[in-house]
């Protein structure tokens, strides 16, 4: 299940980025919900909030390590744990989605722009964020279950 989730995220991420790159000019902004949500063709050579700009080798190494750890966790820790499988699949898909951009373009295509100063993001970023949140939720649930079983 984790690998299926990852493949779906990678496919959606790459399809949406391809649509942005082929259908929008760099810097073009299309309102979806005025003052709230926009499609905005943007490129990022760093991470969220513009940190680590141009540090591609750093991202290559870190992403490779993260992907390896996630695959290890899927194979060893996620058996029988649906929430953990989904969480790890989301993180894996998000990590690989942005990794593909860095390998092919030397930058990441971002296009979801919300109100305020929130960073522009993409499907891979969303999957990573949701996956990490579900991973943390799983840790809390497992801790609570272990606490109950020792009573």
From Swiss-Prot:
InterPro entries with a match to the protein in the record: Peptidase_A8 (IPR001872)
Domain of life: Bacteria
Keyword field: Aspartyl protease, Cell membrane, Hydrolase, Membrane, Protease, Transmembrane, Transmembrane helix
GO cellular component, one term: plasma membrane
Membrane-spanning residues: 54-74, 83-103, 120-140
Pathway: Protein modification; lipoprotein biosynthesis (signal peptide cleavage)
GO biological-process terms attached to the record: proteolysis
Predominant subcellular localization, coarse grouping: membrane
Catalytic activity: Release of signal peptides from bacterial membrane prolipoproteins. Hydrolyzes -Xaa-Yaa-Zaa-|-(S,diacylglyceryl)Cys-, in which Xaa is hydrophobic (preferably Leu), and Yaa (Ala or Ser) and Zaa (Gly or Ala) have small, neutral side chains
Residues of the active site: 110, 125
Record-stated family: Belongs to the peptidase A8 family.
Function: This protein specifically catalyzes the removal of signal peptides from prolipoproteins.
NCBIfam families from the UniProt entry: lspA
Protein name: Lipoprotein signal peptidase
Gene source species: Shouchella clausii (strain KSM-K16)
């Amino acid at each position: 299940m984790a690998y299926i989730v990852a493949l779906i995220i990678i496919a959606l991420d790459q399809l949406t980025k391809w649509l942005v790159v082929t259908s929008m000019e760099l810097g073009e902004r299309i309102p979806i919900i005025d003052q709230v949500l926009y499609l905005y063709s943007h490129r990022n050579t760093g991470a969220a909030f513009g940190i680590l700009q141009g540090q591609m080798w750093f991202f290559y190494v870190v992403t490779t390590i993260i992907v390896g750890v996630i695959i290890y966790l899927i194979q060893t820790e996620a058996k029988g744990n649906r929430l953990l499988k989904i969480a790890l699949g989301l993180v894996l898909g998000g990590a690989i989605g942005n990794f593909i951009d860095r390998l092919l373009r030397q930058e990441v295509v971002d296009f979801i722009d919300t109100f305020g100063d929130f960073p522009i993001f993409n499907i891979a970023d969303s999957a990573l964020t949701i996956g990490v949140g579900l991973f943390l939720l799983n840790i809390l649930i497992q801790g609570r279950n272990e606490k109950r079983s020792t009573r």
